[in-house]
Structures are given as C-alpha cells and as structure tokens.
Amino acid sequence: MSHLEAEALRRALGECTIGREIVVLEETTSTNDAVLQMATANTREGLVLFAEHQTAGRGQRNNRWESAAHKGLWFSILLRPMIDISKSARLTAWAAETVAKTILQELALAVTIKLPNDVCVEEKKVAGVLVEMRAQENAPHLAIAGIGINVNQTVEDFSEELRPHAISLAIALDQPVDQQEFAVALLRNLDRTYREIFASYESGSSSLLLDVKTRRRRRIN
C-alpha cells in the first residue's frame, strides 16, 4: 500500500510555487471541496491538497469519479490566475496537457487528450481534470484545479461498468508506479508550465490551446 508523504513532497519541490504548501488527507469527500473550505482571501496560490481516498470524487458534469484508496493520485491545487472566470477552460487544457506530457516523459506511454478534460492511454481514461473558479472580494479570482490519476489500480479495482473505459498506469505498464516520485515530477511540471503559459496569455502568445481547441482527440508527442 502506497502512502504519500507531505513533507517529503514539499522538500523535493524546492522553490516551486505549486506545492509551497502540501496537505495529505487520509480521506475526504472531494479534494476540490476540501480546498474550497480551506481557502480565504489571504490564502496564497500553490496549496496542494491530496487525499488517499475520496468518497465523493467528481468529474465534469458532476459525473462520479472512482477513487480507490491508496491506488491513485487524487489532488487539487489552489491557484489565482489573472484570467476571467469565463476563461476557466484554459486552466483545464493546461492541466490536462501537463498530466499527459508527464506520463509520456516519465513512463514512455503513448497518451491522447480527449476534450474537454480526459487523458487517455490505450484509448481508455487514465486521468481527468475538473477546474472550478470563484470570485473573491479583495483578492484575485480563486481557481481550484482538481486532478485525478489512476496509478496502481488492478482491473479488479474498477467497477464492471468502468472496466471497458478505464485504465491505470500500472495496468498499461504491467508493473506498479512509485506514486511519490510521479507526484513530484508532475507537480514540478505543473509549476513550470503554469508560470510559462499563463504569463503569455496577456500577450496572446500562448501556444498551448491552439491545438487543444481545434481537435477532439490528439496524441501527445
């Protein structure tokens, strides 16, 4: 059974903004809801909250997300991007693409993105993103980027209904994945790409969404 260690994650991330504060809960209803409950106007962006198990994880359109205990990465990031609430799809695209590229770079698995928020391996869903934004008085807008990744589930861990459509990284690799190491790599990439991409939105120079917007499914290279 894999357990995430908050302090070890924090040390490994060094000066990263995303991951400047890390919380690991054994169980919560939804990591997005847990972050929203913690956030105040003074909460700095970069807080990351993991849960070893979600009892009411959800995806787009409030679809239920199965979150097997200790078998995946279920987490949410508190952000304060300088974008309008109506542009939250940009955050969804950023998170999905960064998850996909990290899977490719770290595990050498072929990955596709199925809009608006699914990351797929072998044409099956391995990860999903749910971004929610809120206006706050006297503070930049609050964005919560929820990410769920199936890491070490076996086929039996998925319900019969999901088995034809879901996969884990371990199933695709035929071996378990070190969740702590993968989490560090992903958070580093999320931190770097968040700063790079959102800094370029004001000038209209972002290259991330051009391709994502124009294709319903595309392969990550």
Predicted regions and their residues:
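N-terminal lobe of the biotin/lipoate ligase/transferase fold
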Residues: 1-106, 177, 195
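Long, positively charged amphipathic alpha-helical accessory segments at protein N-termini or as interdomain linkers
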Residues: 17, 85-111, 121-221
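Short loop/edge segments at beta-strand edges and connector loops
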Residues: 26, 113-115
